[in-house]
Amino acid sequence: MTYESSNDGGSRQQILVLARADADSVQPKTELALACFGLDYNLRSQIVKFNRSSADYRIVVKDYSEYATDDDYNAGLTKLNTEIISGNIPDILANSMLLPIRQYAAKGLLEDLWPYIDADPECSRDKLMTKPLESLQTDGKLYQLPIDFGVTTAIGLGKVVDGYDTWTLADVNDALSKLPEGATVFNKYYTQAEMLQYCVAMNADSFMNWQDGTCNFDSDEFRALLEFVKPFPAEYDWQSDSEEYESDYSRLKNGKQLLYPTSLYSFDDLYYTFAALNNDARFVGFPREDGSTGNAFNSDATLCITTTCKDKAGAWAFIRSTLEEDFQKSLWNFPILKSAFEANAKEAMTQEYETDADGNQILDENGNPIPISTGGMSYGDEPMIELYAVTQEQYDTVMAVIDSTTSFVDYDQNVMNIISDEAAGYLAGSKTVEEASKLIQSRVSLYIQEQK
């Protein structure tokens, strides 16, 4: 007997009868190696489904997170990266925003997926969400395809952050000055190291170009990033903190905090954010000196086909299966398939009402129909908020956030280590921001050249 459950809430039990088969009657399948560092639940389920349904291919997963140790969580990530760079390359990569995909692409290790999309009779560019894919392109080529997406951003209260034409470090400091003394930009628990990693991952494509082999850390934009990080504590002293815990939402509403860094993954997230902030939420993003929006797309998993893949048609067949309507509609995050996104939006904006046995709406004491909640969400010390239909204004807001976002979260552990090492002197006060940025520029430039 087997038991299966799915992320859309469905489940089933099956009684299976196993019958011995002649080995000669079993059609061999081409095995394709998929390497990852941790495997998303949705993707794992799709691999199982694909392996059962495909007569020609079988995806074999090697999860390098099993090499993580108590002393080094990233040991498996280092091992995977080392193997890829040395030529031991899998057929498919599943990236959970931790692999240096742009570096692999610059080395010629990854296939451009646009030709596969364009040649597929059941798929086309206009069937996919445009903005996340545009942000992943390198010189017009698409080396990784997300199964879903969210938007990493920063939220503020409209009464505080409205009225700014730009959102630079100076603008953030000006907005902060409107709050009571002692207010912080983000929650007081965030440290310099956490915020530095956050900001670099969101802005990596602004400072590094693997195709050209160049970087731009000795710049006003990067120095502004370091200056933004410096006011955060090096470590947070939890033992000396006698105050009761307050969530980001509570601190925002109480004037103790300017911004809340978060990610929008679904229409439920959108509704909750507006409700928790009394409909005064503004998705202003992180400060950027170049005038662009300080948001970045993210994904639970992006998929790549390597140039050494033993059967690229088979690899694409698997990736193509993640774009099927049923799979896309079942995802927790925003679907990358446009029709599934639109279907989810329509469902989120449709309000259901209580009815009697005959299907007639039940009215409250004021003669109004009684809306049905689709569930509830809570965060930290915030009370449970019942979820109802998303309004047109809220939908327009999230679409504006998506349409204005041009970056995708990108992470390279080696580059992050260099930045952390050289930024430490500035953050501790022993170096100027100019000295730190020049050292980072020099070391990252050398690292890029060594990787060619």
Where are these regions (language model features)?
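Extracytoplasmic/periplasmic substrate-recognition and gating elements
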Residues: 274-355, 403-404
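Short helices/loops that flank or line small-molecule/ion binding pockets
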Residues: 71-89, 93, 102, 174-178, ...
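Conserved N-terminal structural module of periplasmic/extracytoplasmic solute-binding proteins
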Residues: 1-100, 360-363, 367, 421, ...
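C-terminal capping/gating helix-and-loop segments adjacent to ligand/active sites or protein-protein/ligand interfaces
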Residues: 365-444
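Extracytoplasmic/periplasmic solute-binding protein
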Residues: 141-152, 171-230, 254-259
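Hinge/lid segment of periplasmic solute-binding proteins
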Residues: 98-153, 167-171, 281-287
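Glycine-centered hinge/linker elements that transmit conformational signals in sensory
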Residues: 212-246, 272, 281-286
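Short, solvent-exposed loop/beta-turn-alpha elements that line the ligand-binding surface or hinge
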Residues: 114-127, 205-226, 285-296, 429
